[in-house]
Regions:
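Structural preference for solvent-exposed beta-strand-turn elements
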Residues: 1-172
Length: 172
């Protein structure tokens, strides 16, 4: 992935394209991202992402695309203004390669956040307090490869349970 050559049409198809900001800043120090698209459930804020990455030393501008740059990310104390899952993920992925310690307060703590932290630790990251709303991340210079099994999607599981209850059906 080249940080300034992302396909605008693909980025506009998914809201999650904003999740490229943290890892690309950690990897290359730059990202030019066409505006994310995807679902039309409602307005999706990205300012929590921008403010958190800014605390780590990233600069941000907007002119038809989001432009993030950070020659060197540095650890910081960050209070997320909302416990956003994607902003927490973005901040974690940037902070693992930032120089020094990062403390993320009001972090989302959903199971997939915990699994992301466990996976990154397997790759050589140093993330503590996994599962809490305050994460402590000591940045590392390098990550390495590894294998990780992702657990079941708890939202999908509860959807099936709810459907069975409403229809008085069974789950097999």
């Amino acid at each position: 992935i080249h940080p300034s050559d992302l396909d605008p049409d693909l980025c506009r198809q998914i809201r999650a394209s904003i999740l490229l900001a943290g890892p690309m800043l950690a990897r290359s120090g730059e990202l030019i991202l066409p505006p994310p698209g995807g679902d039309v459930i409602g307005r999706r804020r990205v300012d929590t992402h921008i403010l958190a990455l800014n605390k780590l030393g990233a600069l941000f501008s907007y002119n038809d695309c989001f432009h993030f740059s950070a020659p060197q990310l540095k650890g910081a104390e960050i209070l997320l203004d909302e416990a956003s899952v994607t902003a927490t993920e973005n901040t974690i992925m940037a902070a693992v390669k930032a120089e020094g310690r990062t403390i993320i307060r009001n972090a989302a703590s959903e199971p997939h956040i915990q699994q992301l932290c466990q996976f990154l630790n397997l790759l050589g990251a140093d993330i503590k307090n996994i599962g809490s709303n305050t994460l402590i991340i000591d940045g590392v210079k390098e990550l390495h490869g590894g294998e990780f099994t992702i657990g079941p999607d708890y939202l999908e599981v509860i959807s099936f349970v709810g459907a069975a209850v409403v229809t008085r059906g069974e789950i097999r």
